[in-house]
């Protein structure tokens, strides 16, 4: 399963609402440098950033953190999933 990086999702939500990255930075007090690396797919969304985005955009911080976790798991599965399946045997009960 291929999931979009949260930066793409954030950028899309902002575009739909006509909110610039600069405005998001000013009104959430998230540094512009952090927003820039998030929307460019170079950094994950932290719990604090999720709280700030949820407060500003509405909804729950859990949505942002859950999407981030799903993305991270998908990336890790592509990177090392086969190796883990070979190295780790299921526990026998």
Give each language-model segment a name.
Residues 1-19, 66:
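A short, Lys/Arg-rich alpha-helix, primarily the initiator
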Residues 13, 34-38, 46-48:
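A generic structured-segment signal
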Residues 15, 26, 55:
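Short polybasic/polar patches that bind polyanions
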Residues 19-40:
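Short alpha-helical DNA-recognition segment
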Residues 40-42, 69:
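Residue-level detection of the helix-turn-helix DNA-binding "recognition helix"
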Residues 42-55:
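Short, basic-rich loop-to-helix N-cap that marks the start of a DNA-contacting helix
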Residues 55, 63-93:
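Short, charged recognition helix plus adjacent turn
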Residues 59:
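Short glycine-/polar-rich loops that comprise or flank the Walker A/P-loop
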